Amino acid sequence: MHGHRAPGGAGPSEPEHPATNPPGAAPPACADSDPGASEPGLLARRGSGSALGGPLDPQFVGPSDTSLGAAPGHRVLPCGPSPQHHRALRFSYHLEGSQPRPGLHQGNRILVKSLSLDPGQSLEPHPEGPQRLRSDPGPPTETPSQRPSPLKRAPGPKPQVPPKPSYLQMPRMPPPLEPIPPPPSRPLPADPRVAKGLAPRAEASPSSAAVSSLIEKFEREPVIVASDRPVPGPSPGPPEPVMLPQPTSQPPVPQLPEGEASRCLFLLAPGPRDGEKVPNRDSGIDSISSPSNSEETCFVSDDGPPSHSLCPGPPALASVPVALADPHRPGSQEVDSDLEEEDDEEEEEEKDREIPVPLMERQESVELTVQQKVFHIANELLQTEKAYVSRLHLLDQVFCARLLEEARNRSSFPADVVHGIFSNICSIYCFHQQFLLPELEKRMEEWDRYPRIGDILQKLAPFLKMYGEYVKNFDRAVELVNTWTERSTQFKVIIHEVQKEEACGNLTLQHHMLEPVQRIPRYELLLKDYLLKLPHGSPDSKDAQKSLELIATAAEHSNAAIRKMERMHKLLKVYELLGGEEDIVSPTKELIKEGHILKLSAKNGTTQDRYLILFNDRLLYCVPRLRLLGQKFSVRARIDVDGMELKESSNLNLPRTFLVSGKQRSLELQARTEEEKKDWVQAINSTLLKHEQTLETFKLLNSTNREDEDTPPNSPNVDLGKRAPTPIREKEVTMCMRCQEPFNSITKRRHHCKACGHVVCGKCSEFRARLVYDNNRSNRVCTDCYVALHGVPGSSPACSQHTPQRRRSILEKQASVAAENSVICSFLHYMEKGGKGWHKAWFVVPENEPLVLYIYGAPQDVKAQRSLPLIGFEVGPPEAGERPDRRHVFKITQSHLSWYFSPETEELQRRWMAVLGRAGRGDTFCPGPTLSEDREMEEAPVAALGATAEPPESPQTRDKT
C-alpha cells in the first residue's frame, strides 16, 4: 500500500494501518532502516525490473530513487541509510523474508542489488533472517509472532563486485544519424513475471521506459559505473519539487531548478512526436523497432565526463551528445549554445537552398535541357560510331589480314576459310570508315549552325542493306572459326595472339564478329530516342522519320536473311535425310512440315509406315530404308501442290483418315492421333491457299484451268490421264465395275484402271494408253477410258460386249455414290430367319429413297445384291427364346419375315434401330436420330404402322430438327 503525501507536501504523513495486501500486490515497505535489509539471502533472478529498470513501486524506492520510478505526490518510506551516490551494477535480485517489523505487517521484501553504498564503502554483514524464494507463495498472511525457521547458508559477507576500470568508463561516441524504423502497430505485452510480484500502480510516468531500457542494457552489456542524480518524474502539471526524507547524517539532495528539471525530463522520456508511436508504458519496453542498445539510456554522473544521452525520441535529439544540465557544473550552458548555433546555421543553409527559381529562368533551363538531350543523343551516335569503326578495323585489318597472310604465305589453312569467316566485312568497314563516320564528325563540329543528323542518315541508310549478307553468313562463320581452331594449330595461335592485344579488350574473335549483327538494331534504337527528344516542329523531324524507315527496312532485310538461312539449314538436313537422292536445296523452296504418317494400302487397306515431306511447291511421299549409318528415306512419289486436292475420307470405319489427291498420285493417309491429323490438314490447306494466291498474283491461272482444278477427279468432265485417279481398294469391290461379273481368285482377278482408278476384270482392261501424269508412259486402262482417250477401237474382242445397249437394272446403283448421299450406311452382319449363318454386307439407306434398304457386297460395288422395302417392318430386340451368338443384335419383322442385324458398336445399333423404325412407320428422315429418339428406341421397341405406302419416285424432304 502506498503512503499518502501530507497536504503541505513537505514531510511524510503518518503510516497507514497495516492491512493484508490484495493478491498480486507488493507488500508494504519498511518504516525505518533495517540492519538486515541489505543482507544477501536466498536470491531469485528477476525477469525484468531492478534498481534502474522497470517501474518500481514507491514503497521499494530508497531516499534517492525518485528518479527511478517514484512519482510525485507519493510517500517514500526509508529502508535504511540512504547514500548520495549509487553504483549501477549488472545484476538484480529478489530477496524475501527478513526480521519482522514492529507495528507493520511483514510481507515480501525486495533487495535491489544495483543500489549500494559509496564506491569505497563495503557492505556490512547482517544477521541471517528467514528467507524464501520469491516464487514460493508461502502462507497467505503472516503475523509478527510467526517467523519461519532460518535457512542454512555459508557464513561470511557477500563479495563486492569490483568497479570497472577507468579506461572502460569513457563515454561512447554517438552513432551516425540514421532514420529510426517505424514501430510496430501495437506495443509489446508486459512481462507476466513482473506482474506477479509488483503491486498495482497508477499510470507509469514516461521515465519508466528509460528505466526499463537500463535493465535490458545491464543484462546484455558490461557494467557501467555511474552516479545517479535524483530526477523528478513527469506530471500533468508543472513539476513540483519533491522532498525526500534524509537521515541527519546525510545532507539533503539538492533540487533542480524548474527549467533544468523539465529539460532532464524531456531528455529522459520524450513525448510522442508527429509520426511516432507512444512507447509501451505497461511493460516498460519500447517498440520492437526502436533501438535497444546501450545508447538509449541516460546517465548522470558527478565525477566522470559528461555521458551521452540517446533516449528514445526524435532523431535530432537521439543523435546529438547531450549532458544533463547541472547548475553546479560549468560548461553545460556552453555546450547547449554551441549545438543551437550549429542547428541555426544548418537551417539557414537549407533555406538558402530552397530559394525559388524565377519562372523565366526555369523555362530557359527547360529549353536548354531539350536541346542538350538532342545533342547528347547525336553525340552518343558519334561516339558509338567511333568505337564501332575501331572494332571493324580490328576485324578487317588485324584478324583478317594476319590470317590471309598466313594462308597465302605458308598455306597452313585455305584462304577460302578466311573469306568464309569474314564475308563482306571489308565493304562494311570501308563504308563506315570513309563515309558515315566522317559525315557524323563534320556535322557534330557544325552542330551550332546545323543541329540535325536526319539528312545524313537518310542519305546513307540504304547502304546498310549490305549487312544482310554478313548476317546470313554469321552462323557458318562462327562454325568455321570453331572448326579451324581445333584443326589448325597455326590458325589457333594467330587468333590467340590477336586476342591478347590491348585493342582487343580481352574479348574473343566471336564477340567482335557479333557486333556488326547488333549494329543496325542499335541505330534503330538511337534514332527512335532522337525522334522522341526532338521538339515539336523541328526541321529535322521529317528527315529523321524517313531515316528511321530506311533503317527499319535494313533491319527487316537482315532478319529476312536470317530466316532464309535458317530455312536453308532445314533444307540441307532434309537433303542429308534423303541421302542426296532429291535435289531440294533451292532458294525458292521452303520446308513446311515433315513427319511420319500411316498410309492405307489401295489393295487391302492395311496401314504402312511412311514419311511425308511437305514443301511450298510439292509433297514428297517417302518410304524408309535401312542403312549402316542410320535410317534414311527413299522418295516413292512426288505430288505437285499445283492441282492438289485435300478431302475427308467417307469411310466411317477408318477414323483419322484423309485423302490427298494430286496430278501424280492420290494417297489415303491415316494419322495416329486427332491432333496429328489436324496439324497435317492445316499445313496442307495453308500451302494450297498460298499457292493459289501466288498464281493469282502472277496471273498464271486462267478460267479454263480454274474449271479443271475445281472439278473433282472422278467426274466425267475431267480429262483422263492428266492427273492421277483416286484408286479404289480391291477389297471394297466384289464385282467388276464395268461388266458387273463377280470376282474370284482364279478366273476373275482384279485389275486397276490407271486412268479412272476403278477395279475391273481382265477382259475389261485389255487396253493400254499413254498417260500424261505418268510422263506419257503406257499404262493399263479400262475399255471406257480407252474409248475416251483414243476413240472406239476397230477390232477389239471387248468392243462387241459394249456395243449393244442393254436395259439398266434398278439395282445398278453405285454404292459409293449412294453412300455419299445417304441417311445411314455401314457394314452389318445379317441373317435371315431360318438361315444357317451370319453374312457381312454393306447396307445403305439412300436419301432419295429413304424407305428402301440396299444391300451391297462392298462399299464400291456398282450394283446392289438386293433391296428391301422397309414400310411395315417392326424394329425391336430379339425375343427371349432366341439366343444369337453375336453382340448388339436387333431384328425387323413383318408377317412371317424376320431379319437379324448385328452392328459393330452399341452406338451404331441405336442409330440403325432409329432409322429403320422411322422407315417402318413411313416417316421422312432427318440426317440422324436425336439422342432422345435413341433412348426411346433403346427402352422400348417402336410399334410398326399397319398402313403401307408406295415408294416415292422423287427424293423426300427430310425433317429439320
Curated annotation (Swiss-Prot):
Q: Which residues carry this modification: Phosphothreonine?
A: 711
Q: Sorted alphabetically, which SMART domains does this protein's record hold?
A: FYVE (SM00064), PH (SM00233), RhoGEF (SM00325)
Q: Where is this region: Disordered?
A: 1-353, 702-726, 925-961
Query: Please, which domain of life does this record's source organism belong to?
Result: Eukaryota
Principal localization?
Answer: cytoplasm
Q: Where does Zn(2+) 1 bind?
A: 736, 739, 761, 764
Q: In which tissues is it expressed?
A: Expressed in fetal heart, brain, lung, kidney and placenta. Less expressed in liver; adult heart, brain, lung, pancreas and skeletal muscle.
ZnF regions (FYVE-type) run across 730-790
- Provide ranges: composition bias, Basic and acidic residues: 125-135, 273-284
Any idea where this protein resides? Answer: Cytoplasm; Cell projection, Lamellipodium; Cell projection, Ruffle; Cytoplasm, Cytoskeleton
Database matches in InterPro entries: DBL_dom_sf, DH_dom, FGD1-4_PH2, FGD1_PH1, FYVE_RhoGEF_PH, PH-like_dom_sf, PH_domain, Znf_FYVE
Record-level Gene Ontology MF annotations: guanyl-nucleotide exchange factor activity; small GTPase binding; zinc ion binding
Arranged from A to Z, the UniProt key words for this protein are:
Cell projection, Cytoplasm, Cytoskeleton, Disease variant, Guanine-nucleotide releasing factor, Metal-binding, Phosphoprotein, Repeat, Zinc, Zinc-finger
| Occurrences of domain DH (ranges) | 373-561
* Keyword Ribosomal protein included in the entry's annotation: no
Medical condition linked? Aarskog-Scott syndrome: An X-linked recessive, rare multisystemic disorder characterized by disproportionately short stature, and by facial, skeletal and urogenital anomalies. Some patients manifest intellectual disability, attention deficit disorder and hyperactivity.
Q: What is known of its domains?
A: The DH domain is involved in interaction with CCPG1.
The name on file for this protein is FYVE, RhoGEF and PH domain-containing protein 1
